[in-house]
Amino acid sequence: MSFAHIGVIKGVITDSISNNVIPYVNVVLESNNKKQVTTTDDFGKFMFSDLKEGSYQLTFYSMGFAHKTMALELKDDEVKTISIMVQLRPNALNLSEVTVNGTKDIGETMNKVNNIDMLLRPTNSAQDLLKLVPGLFIAQHQGGGKAEQIFLRGFDCDHGTDFAVFVDGMPVNMVSHAHGQGYADMHFVIPETVDALTVSKGTYCTKYGDFATSGAGEFTSKNHLDNDMIKLEYGQYGAYRALAMLNLLGKDKHLFSKKKEDLYIAAEYNYNVASYFVNHQNYQRENLFLKYFGMLTDHTSLSISGTYFNSIWNGSGQVPQRAINQGIITRFGALDPTEGGTTSRTNGNASLKTVFDNGAILKNQVYYSYYQFNLFTNFTFFLNDTVNGDGINQRENGRNLYGYNGSYEINKDVFGANLKTIVGLGSRSDDGQVGLFHQNKRVVFDTIVLGTRQIHNVNAYLDETYQITKKLFINAGVRADYFNYYFKSQLTNKPELNDSLSGSTSKTKWSPKLNVYYNFNNNVQLFARSGYGFHSNDVRAVVTNPNQQTLPSALGYEVGSTFKPMQNMLVNVALWGLNLVEELTYGGDDGTINISGRTQRLGVDFSVRYQLTKALFADLDVNYSHGRFVDLPEGQNYIPLSPTFTSVAGLTLKPKKGFSASLRYRYISNRAAIEDNSITALGYFLLDGVVNYNIPHFQFGLRVDNIFNVDWNEAQFETLTRMKGEPAQGVDELCFTPGAPRIFRLNVTFFFPNTQKNE
């Protein structure tokens, strides 16, 4: 009597051009009309075990690569394990090869949409990166220097209060920031260095904690350069940009090991006069990025990166509509021409990743940031101080941000089905001095708030995904966050107030999650998600006012589907809701937090990606939300600036060579700027276009923003203001920063081959 061996097929998948491993490749194993699906790990490895003798067919799919099929035989008299090396050839995007359920994480089917956008849409700025998140709108209102105002799923997230942002696992949001809670300045990121975007809308992912109420976005930088490059750009109204990205390891050069290693540097310089403003913006920014990635062993990788960013700018602020109507200023004029500021951030980031023989993955990361911020603004002009004006100076006098992220992931067979367990542990600390001052023409003459703050967060999470059947998955998890707050007031002009403004407190928040996924087939996934999340409050509020919520909870829930109605079309739809215990708004003039009470938001997200021909793609995002305060009377319960209807769509032509082009629109509808809807924030429709021409080693590009030269309000608020000579009580109306007019930009890029080839 003989018994068939139980065999194993395993392998490593690499890029046929660069020889770099390809993570998250969909691998399909077929035999006797039975199919198994897996994905490669972070090191490009895959494995199928418990295989009986017979004939097998392997097919490999990865977005941006040509699919590949190969046949294998497992014979009873051969070794139990077959190891193979597979190389995939880079190729144009083909939506017919994209499967819905072939993801490393069962809950990340939405990121199929993001991956398509990353391959098709040009990104030339940090703003472009944020706009890759479906349904996310942004607004800039300080000469380009401040973090963008973010709108998503019915939230005016301010500068990040309700949207968490990460770059290579490092948090971007700043707790208890001088300009507002959760402030997320992405301008230290050079867009050409970004390799991938992971989006998690809602409160359903255990990995994300503070600020991840409307959602979270995580950007991952490239581990290597396919080509060295130099790019030069010139735009109307005095816009200049220069970029260089260079590999620093030549052929057969190594640093720490004899295995595959990469080291590259990227440097960017931006200067934008923005002369369409009467008070020229003169925005100037320098960026530097250095990254090492290497395989220390066959199972362990090391990533080390450093970032430097510095910018300086002038701003025209938000101007009241009546000042334009009365002819006091033009649309691009300024009532206080001395607005502006400076900011800088320096980052260090190191990550060690190990994949064990049993497939378990251990990740350890440490990071450090040093941050400065100095902003001069004037929101109300002469409402509070009729002599000197209401100018304020918000200042971060050197923030230290440092932390650790760790996780352990393992798959086990439990009752004949797969159970994936992820255990995570993290910490984050912020310390430094924060201040708010009264200023006139950038000369400070009074201190409103000044003190040192320390915020410490320790978090842990457990995430379990159990495959009940071949099609049904349940994901359950819980996250625990502990916060400790400390603030020491340092007012010298009013020392008698320091004790009452100082203090410490701590709070723990538990956030359970429960999600269900059903893979109807390779092209249809149904899902139902739910979970608690939160956004934290400012240290200056929680240590002095015990009645304020320290960590207000959010409950999110949604049902939906990601599916392919035809081979070359991908659709995602979700019906969602989110209840927030406490709506928090930062009052910049006095450094206080305004509590607005409970809110509920209900909405629908709809996204389509469609490949019309081999080189022509169409995309559409439509988003609707209905948000209201729960405890306010009907008609008085609008959530100010909460977006209701937004849409983005475009056509992209991307052949292998020659001309490529993109034509895209952005639309946001009118929305309430105040609770009773008596003041309206105006919507807009903008059309943008890009044309590129590629020849060997060169790319020439033309970009046109706001093709129809529409007058539009980029940032807008209901604000009580007073100009000189007006009644003391001021006037409550819409104040706004005008959006840019039509702008033409030309660019040229020179590519030269990366000669590095490590074995």
PLM segments and residue spans:
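Transmembrane beta-barrel wall of Gram-negative outer-membrane proteins
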Residues: 8, 234-273, 277-316, 340-357, ...
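Membrane-embedded beta-barrel scaffold of Gram-negative outer-membrane proteins
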Residues: 255, 351-355, 361-379, 519, ...
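Gram-negative outer-membrane beta-barrel transporters
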Residues: 408-409, 415, 576-579, 595-675, ...
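C-terminal beta-signal and adjacent terminal beta-strands/loops
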Residues: 618, 670-671, 693-759
